[in-house]
Design a protein with these regions (language model features):
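Feature of Fe-S/electron-transfer and energy-metabolism proteins
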Residues: 1-621
Length: 621
């Protein structure tokens, strides 16, 4: 550990980089961990003192996030993705191979402190798995040959900056393009269209320019652009499907000193990776949509500011995204007087997540932005009136902002010409699992599941998980259902399982995921997900009985009715669906008894009997 004077100097430097702002605590902790490897007790104590926070507050925040470490970890931290699609591609065997090769047990640190190996939730590389993270950097397409190469680099203590670029090459795998992915919008076009919409010239000067310089009431540009968003019937692409136009209107009308625009790029739902591709290929479009939103909210009269909350697994995108922002500032598309419009000031900063699935929920994300544990807030009030720092805040998904930018340029009628009446436009699907061509597929809303399966080369499919573990698991009899808010809504995940897969193993992976990702705030979710995990593990171990199935049904009802947020409400979906559609996968594992103990008492006491030398009937007393 660094000596105290050097530690204090390091803390001062990092805190200064963040303006001494305690709301940036998560970012400060990430930066300090980057320097020191882990967050040792002296560091936590000194940082708390420097920020004027309690030690318990700082340690509590650090303990909440999976990618912040309060105990020593290896100089090289290798995390294998534990998502079901990675398991289907052999991730468990590959983890065991690397552990044996380097003599490091899963979940442990090597004796010399060089290496630690463990698992993590989905890394967003489902179309090119198995995936893993090394010190936060994503590496796709893992096989034994690649692991041999990684092992050698680690043993040679090669700095990761010197590792071969080929290891980190991530493909976009865009298989089908439609309106969004095939757009030819140039940077600034959507903003300029919004600025001029609804304005009428007087001489050589537009009304908007006269209004700013002569005190004339503002031109209808913001209101007219908002009307186009509303006319398009664009709905949030994060899964909930709330009207984007109504959300922006409510935020615009809410009183506040500053209105905030937040892009939720924390796509932690297992099986989802569309936002990774959008941020890689179409970052300008994302930032364009955020800027249009800021124009609607502020109209150049109210102060606005933007955040992009980037999931920690996408750390490799941080530098390219910051470069894109810098270019847009140079081109007058961010900063002061955007596109030459006096008073239209807006900028965007990127906050990096630290490994918490629950931060995909908008109020939990805002808590994280404020430097807190990512625990969802009670609602109402909603973020549109009381969001970041208590100010009006719009939180939308990456794909939503992209669509909004296109609407600002082309208009609402153009957009709603695609899709269905209740689900306008197109949807990006992250297709993975048992298919020949995994990747990104863009379709107009209303496409059937069967059409997607045909296009991706799926054969002998028995099930599709739509929208990840929190979504809906359907069987072959439902493949004519449609991807749409009125039928099968989705945040984007589309996981394919053929007839060789045991659906019990699939749902068990999902149950373990929810038990790990519960924020722990409310008892129904914290205890309920743990109990669900215990029951399904009991069935997996061959000790399940009909009583356990009934227990699952009771847990589902309690969690759905009493959990604090959406995670607890949807954590039961996998078990609900597998019992409805694939019940034999559970029934064949059950014993004929109505009840079976959760563990073998005699087996558990075997060691005690051996130590005491007793083998009589009362040996357990």
């Amino acid at each position: 550990m660094t000596h105290l004077p050097d530690l204090n100097r390091s803390i001062d430097e990092v805190v200064a980089l963040h303006g001494g702002d305690a709301t940036r605590l998560v970012q400060i902790l990430l930066d300090l961990q980057e320097r020191h490897g882990w967050l040792a007790p002296p560091l936590v104590t000194a940082l708390a003192r420097r920020l004027g926070l309690s030690r318990a507050r700082v340690e509590g925040v650090a303990a909440f996030y999976s990618f912040l470490y309060l105990e020593p970890v290896g100089q090289y931290r290798v995390l294998f993705s534990d998502n079901i699609t990675d398991r289907m591609q052999g991730s468990e065997a590959l983890l065991a191979y690397l552990s044996e090769k380097l003599w490091v047990e899963k979940g442990k640190v090597s004796e010399d402190g060089l290496l630690s190996i463990d698992t993590t939730s989905c890394t967003g590389l489902c179309d090119q798995g198995p995936g893993l993270l090394v010190n936060g950097w994503a590496i796709p397409r893992i096989d034994r040959e690649r692991l041999d190469q990684i092992a050698q680099l680690i043993l040679e203590r090669q700095p990761m900056a010197q590792w071969p670029d080929e290891l980190f090459r991530i493909e976009d795998n865009i298989r089908r393009q439609d309106t969004l992915l095939a757009h030819n919008l140039r940077p600034g076009q959507a903003i300029r269209a919004a600025l001029t919409r609804g304005e009428s010239p007087e001489g050589d000067r537009p009304v908007s320019e006269r209004s700013w310089r002569e005190g004339i009431p503002a031109a209808p540009g913001p209101a007219a652009t908002l009307e186009e968003i509303k006319r398009s019937n664009l709905r949030g692409r994060g899964g909930a499907g709330f009207s984007t136009g109504l959300k922006w209107e409510a935020c615009r009308d809410a009183p506040g000193d500053t209105h905030y625009v937040v892009c939720n790029a924390d796509e932690g739902e297992p099986g989802t990776f569309k936002d990774r591709v959008l941020l890689t290929r179409h970052a300008d479009l994302v930032f364009e949509g955020m800027t249009v939103c800021a124009y609607i909210l502020g109209g150049g009269r109210t102060k606005t500011h933007g955040f992009l909350y980037l999931r920690g697994e996408y750390r490799h995108l941080l530098d390219p995204l910051n470069e894109c922002l810098a270019r847009r500032r140079r081109d007058g598309l961010l900063g002061k007087d955007i596109c030459g419009r006096p008073g239209f000031d807006f900028d965007i900063e990127i906050h990096l997540g630290a490994g918490a699935y629950v931060c995909g929920e908008e109020s939990a994300l805002i808590e994280s932005l404020e430097g807190k544990r990512g625990i969802p807030r009670n609602r109402p009030p909603y973020p549109v009136t009381h969001g970041y720092l208590g100010q009006p805040t719009v939180v939308n998904n990456v794909e939503t902002f992209c669509a909004a930018a296109l609407i600002a340029k082309e208009g609402g009628d153009w957009y709603r010409a695609q899709g269905t009446a209740k689900s306008t436009g197109t949807k990006l699907l992250s297709v993975s699992g048992d298919c020949e061509r995994p990747g990104i597929y863009e379709y107009p809303f209303g496409v059937t599941v069967r059409q997607v399966l045909d296009d991706c080369g799926a054969r002998r499919t028995q099930a599709v998980q739509v929208s990840g573990p929190s979504g809906t698991l359907i069987d072959a009899s439902e493949f004519d259902r449609r991807i749409a808010f009125e039928d099968l809504p989705t945040a984007g995940a589309f996981m394919v399982f053929d007839e060789t897969r045991d659906m019990f193993d699939v749902v068990r992976n999902f149950v373990h995921f929810f038990a790990h990702e519960s924020c722990g705030f409310c008892t129904p979710c914290r205890v309920g997900t743990a109990m669900m995990k215990g029951v399904i593990d009991k069935i997996h171990a061959g000790r399940g009985a009909q009583h356990d199935v009934e227990e699952i049904c009771r847990l589902q009802k309690v969690m759905y009715l009493a959990a604090h947020c959406g995670l607890g409400h949807t954590a039961c979906n996998p078990m609900r669906d597998v019992m409805q559609r694939f019940r034999p996968a559970i029934q064949r594992r059950l014993k004929s008894l109505d009840f079976e103990p959760a563990f073998d008492l005699d087996g558990a006491l075997a060691v005690a009997r051996q130590m005491t030398g007793r083998d009589d009937a009362k040996a357990h007393l």
